[in-house]
């Protein structure tokens, strides 16, 4: 075997251990660490391989989603051959390709209030790469109860932000954001898009924060948030302190209800809608996505009215007996439902989970993206 391929920490991590203040001791702390990563999507795809390459001993991956073709532009840990496969498994295989000595635990589940504390048990640090506020508040609260640090990040369009929540050392996510924004008010990647390189930048900073906390080098982003604007190429830092008005965290709650994203009487599930249509129900389906999305997949018989054009189309919908609005995942349909409600459509409903839920729960032939 060539000398350069002989597997020892000294040659694999030589350039890392040569850093001032790092050395073998810091490398050993990385090797002994157990890090849980929530999400193997846009942020997780940068975080997971970075942790593996740095030598984190055990990586726990939590993700219940599957790889879609539209994920690949920003989720570089997956490839074309992985489309349709569980993201957590695909990510685990990528780790093995970087360093087969890294232990990987795969949990093909969604983080919930029911499983969070069990998943956090025995973990040294959590990295939250999720894409919704309910999971961010849950990950913060569970980390506070477990007494471990949380590195969180978020991206949207051309910008992103990173912070560290650590109840024992400083303020938490709730101190920065005491209450969640109204549903649909913050554009998700689904609704507003995201530049893939923003995911890479933010994911790299998240990984760096994790390495700093584990090894004890540098000053973690405790009480500080770093923001990145890709359009200007600039970084900014915001400082914040503990919020004395925040109630202490003593239990996990229903985070969908807290964030206003739980299904309501104004929602219909995909199986329920399928049953209504099969029974001959008179339902007017209104698709509030964009044309390019409808070109990928749409529900039969639906009418395309992009959200930005909904006000102009209201009069044409007044004769409909029953209106059901849908989008990709549900954010835009919630905003559309508010518009219709304000214009007298008291019985209008939205499809819970959007066309993505229809594909998963009713008709797998409808393409996911």
Language-model segments: which ranges?
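Residue-level detector of alpha-helix initiation sites
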Residues: 42-45, 50, 56, 66-67, ...
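A structured beta-alpha segment of the ubiquitous adenosine-cofactor-binding alpha/beta core
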Residues: 84-136
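Glycine-rich adenosine-cofactor-binding loop
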Residues: 26-52, 58-63
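Glycine-rich phosphate-binding loop and adjoining beta1-alpha1-beta2 segment
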Residues: 4-5, 61-99
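Rhodanese-like catalytic fold shared by cysteine-dependent sulfurtransferases
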Residues: 2, 15, 93, 226-283, ...
């Amino acid at each position: 075997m060539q000398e350069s391929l002989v597997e020892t920490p000294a040659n694999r991590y030589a350039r890392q251990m040569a850093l001032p203040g790092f050395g073998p001791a810091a490398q050993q702390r990385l090797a002994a660490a157990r890090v849980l990563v929530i999400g193997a999507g846009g942020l997780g795809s940068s975080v997971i391989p970075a942790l593996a390459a740095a030598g984190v001993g055990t990586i726990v991956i939590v993700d219940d989603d599957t790889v879609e073709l539209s994920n690949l532009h920003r989720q570089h840990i997956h490839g074309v051959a992985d489309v349709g496969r569980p993201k957590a498994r695909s990510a685990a295989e990528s780790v093995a390709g970087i360093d087969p000595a890294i232990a990987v635990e795969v949990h093909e589940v969604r983080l919930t209030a029911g499983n969070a504390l069990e998943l956090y048990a025995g973990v040294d640090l959590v990295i939250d790469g999720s894409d919704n506020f309910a999971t961010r508040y849950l990950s913060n609260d569970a980390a506070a109860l477990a007494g471990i640090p949380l590195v969180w990040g978020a991206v949207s369009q051309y910008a992103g932000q990173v912070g560290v929540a650590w109840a024992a050392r400083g303020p938490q996510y709730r101190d920065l954001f005491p209450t969640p924004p109204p549903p649909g008010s913050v554009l998700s990647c689904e609704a507003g898009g995201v530049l893939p390189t923003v995911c890479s930048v933010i994911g790299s900073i998240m990984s760096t924060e994790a390495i700093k906390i584990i090894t004890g080098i540098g000053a973690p982003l405790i009480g500080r948030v770093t923001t990145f604007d890709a359009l200007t190429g600039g970084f900014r830092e915001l400082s914040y302190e503990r919020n004395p008005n925040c109630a202490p965290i003593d239990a996990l709650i229903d985070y969908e209800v807290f964030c206003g994203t739980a299904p309501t009487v104004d929602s219909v599930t995909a199986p329920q809608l399928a049953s209504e249509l099969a029974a001959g129900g008179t339902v007017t389906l209104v698709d509030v996505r964009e044309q390019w999305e409808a070109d990928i997949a749409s529900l039969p018989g639906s009418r395309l009215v992009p959200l930005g054009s909904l006000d102009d189309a209201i009069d044409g919908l007044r004769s409909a007996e029953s209106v059901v609005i849908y989008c990709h995942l549900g954010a835009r349909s919630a905003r559309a439902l508010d518009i219709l409600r304000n214009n007298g459509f008291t019985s209008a409903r939205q499809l819970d989970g959007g066309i993505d839920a229809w594909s998963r729960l009713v008709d797998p032939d409808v393409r996911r993206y």
